[in-house]
């Protein structure tokens, strides 16, 4: 009986020490949140750099994208008194299309909330917005 208890205790310790692997969809979800947090804090260039086309965009178009992000935040400020925070909700992996849908919750200053889906793809080892 004592040997069985020791074996059970040993197995429990080994199982408890098992390294927990972080799922790719969890990494993609956190990356999406970071991109939108950067946008929220006025780092428009970092947000645009998180888009799939960032390495092929001509400088003039990149500036237009940055201007669009500024206008978007201005519109949200006008309609909802701005975005208070972005929360990461969940992520769903689509193995057929090789992407992850990251579900974020925008919490506005007027107390309304909006759920947003951000399609994410992995490119060169980093998760970026599609």
Task: Tell me the role of every PLM-derived stretch.
Residues 4-13:
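Sec-dependent N-terminal signal peptides
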Residues 16-41:
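Short, low-complexity N-terminal intrinsically disordered segments enriched in polar/charged residues
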Residues 29-30, 34, 45-97:
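Short solvent-exposed beta->alpha transition segments
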Residues 87-130:
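Exposed beta-sheet edge and beta->alpha loop/turn motif
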